[in-house]
Amino acid sequence: MNFYTSSVGVRQYDHSLLVLNDLTNIHITCEDVHCSAKLLCYIYDVYKSRYPSIDEHSFLRMLKGPDDAEILSTFLRTIIWILSHDRDFPDEFRIPATALVSVYIKYYSDLKPRAPTTNCWTCRMSKNNLPFQVPSIKGFPAEAELYIVPISDHDGKTIEFSGMKTLYKSPSKKKHNYVISSDMPPLSARYTVWDGK
């Protein structure tokens, strides 16, 4: 991909994307396909109407080299929407717009993904899937020393650990599998000794 801007000469297209960035021309060459200033301005207008928080400077920065996965995602969704739903989209822009999607989608592998948000209590409490102490668990004696011990991550990958007291399995199904380490047996029959399977 070649990204080209110019701030000398006659402005090629009268649009805020060029005016507010002090440019006279802008274009991108993707896979030997020329993407003109007119096309980029058209995409910007639709993008801005769908995602009002974007401005001319942010859009230009993203075109030069995306550094935010969320902005890149909304940019690609906008172009795909234009290609599939926009009846006013000129036919001569279809191939260049498709080339833009093809090139910019490759940036995803280079962008560091944001840390996933989680509603999993075990993930929030455990640091790097290490056991953590809890003050009490319903069904265990109040004076018991209790730990939650993660035994697999969300993908089902087993977590290795050693040196724990007797481990008990809860019958509840959670996204994050864990067992309970206790120095005292449970008061409830719903907890069974975990055999490691």
Curated annotation (Swiss-Prot):
UniProt entry tagged with the keyword Kinase: no
Keywords: Host cytoplasm, Host-virus interaction, Inhibition of host innate immune response by virus, RNA-binding, Suppressor of RNA silencing, Viral immunoevasion
Pfam families recorded: Tenui_NS3
Keyword Repeat attached: no
Gene Ontology CC annotation, any one: host cell cytoplasm
Location within or outside the cell: Host cytoplasm
Any one GO biological process: symbiont-mediated suppression of host innate immune response
Annotated GO MF terms: RNA binding
Quaternary structure and partners: Homodimer.
Family: Belongs to the tenuiviruses p3 protein family.
Function: Acts as a suppressor of RNA-mediated gene silencing, also known as post-transcriptional gene silencing (PTGS), presumably through the binding of dsRNA.
Protein name: Suppressor of RNA silencing p3
